[in-house]
Each structure stands twice: as structure tokens, then as C-alpha cells.
Amino acid sequence: MGVAVRTYYASPRHRDDYLESWLELWEGKPGKSALLPGYGWIFGMGDGTCNVGLGILNTSSAFGKTDYKDLLKRWLDNTPDDWAFRSENMIGPVRGAALPMGFNRQPHYERGLLLVGDAGGMINPFNGEGIAYAMESAEIAATAMAEAHGRGPGSPAAERALASYPIKLKAQLGGYYTLGRTFVKLIGHPQVMRVCTRYGLPRRTLMQFTLKLLANLTDAKDGDAMDKLINALSRIAPAA
């Protein structure tokens, strides 16, 4: 489980070419100020504004004990002035939401009810992404419902079609999400995150592997060695 807050700022960075992820949040100068809990992001919307926010996982000791809006302000107040991430440039309020992830809401099917997206805890624990997985689970659910309808609503055959939904869902994402839950437990420890950022970030090949793993960007059929390793780990991991 996680919590995220975000807001929008009028900023010259609105046309940045890339999404920016912050694995460490500092209250001042990096390495010489307080290390804040959580991770952050900045991405330009291309319309004069930037979406800026931070998230905290429940594996962090700060989870549930922190004023997340204040935490966001403390981080952004120490970013460069020309980025314009200041209160006077904020467009709208800071909004927050829970991040149900890694299949933490189950069962996914019970007595005719199928859970998709956030209702079923389907946010990717590796990166906090939820929209794509909501759509993917909805497609699997819709297929099961169509099969059930074709077999005759209320019939035993229809029930079997509906009951196949969580099975197919776990076959598709279960192992990968199990890896993600393990990842979340590890990065909840600041010492682990510090070692990973210090020794991992400078290594391009390792970062390419990390990007594929965290973003779930592997090729299931014709991928390279990295794809095959990640796919193998996902198959081996229990689909719980």
C-alpha cells in the first residue's frame, strides 16, 4: 500500500522531454541536509504546467505519521528558483490518494462481482502506475463476462467462466506483482535505497535492466537477455 500527493505548477519546465523520478528527496543540499521519506516525480504537461508529486510506501517508517502536503512543500522549496515550484505558482490544491497495489485487495471475484483496477489493488508496486493495469484487468474481466453470458446467465458453466477471471489475472500479473512486493519491502529501508542509488545509478546496463523491470517493458517472445531474465523471474515467483 502507498499514499501519493500531487499538484500542478506553472513552470518553464512544462516542455521537458522526459519524466523525472527522484529516488531521494532532500530538504536542502543533497547529502548535507535531512533526507526526506518517499520518492518524487516531475513531468511537464506541455500546457505551461508541471505535474509534481511524491509518494510514500507503507514499508517506510514515516507512512501514516507524516504531513504529506508539508513534505511536498519542504522538498520543492529547495529546488532551483527558476523551476518555479513555489506556492505562488501552484495551479489548484494539493490532492492525495491511497495507492492499493500488488493485489492487496482480494478476492477478485465473488458471487457475480469482479474487481478491476484500484478496487482490486492492481497498481504496479514497482512504479505506482495504475491506469494501464486497470484497463488490462477490465479487458480480462470483460472477456470472462462475455463468456459467461454466452453460456447462459446463472448457469454452472457461466459461473465457471466468471470464476476464471482471478485465475487469468494472476497468470498475467501475479508473479510480476510478487516481485514488486519484494521490491517495495527492500526500498522501504533508507539504507538499501542509498546503496542502490549510489552504486546502481552510474551503471548504464544495470539501469536499463531496472527500467525494464520497474516499467514492465519486457518482450514476452523475442526479447533480449534482460527480457528473458525478468520474464523467467515473473514465472518462477508465486502468483499470489
Annotated model-derived regions:
Residues A146-A240:
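C-terminal helical "tail/cap" subdomain of flavin- and related membrane-associated enzymes
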Residues W22-K29, R86-G92, A98-M101, T210-T218, ...:
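A general structural signal for short secondary-structure boundary/capping elements
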Residues N58-A144, G150, A157:
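FAD/FMN-dependent oxidoreductases across multiple families
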Residues Y8-Y9, Y39-F43, W75, F103, ...:
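Aromatic side chains
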Residues M1-S87:
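Predominantly flavin-linked oxidoreductase catalytic cores and closely associated redox partners
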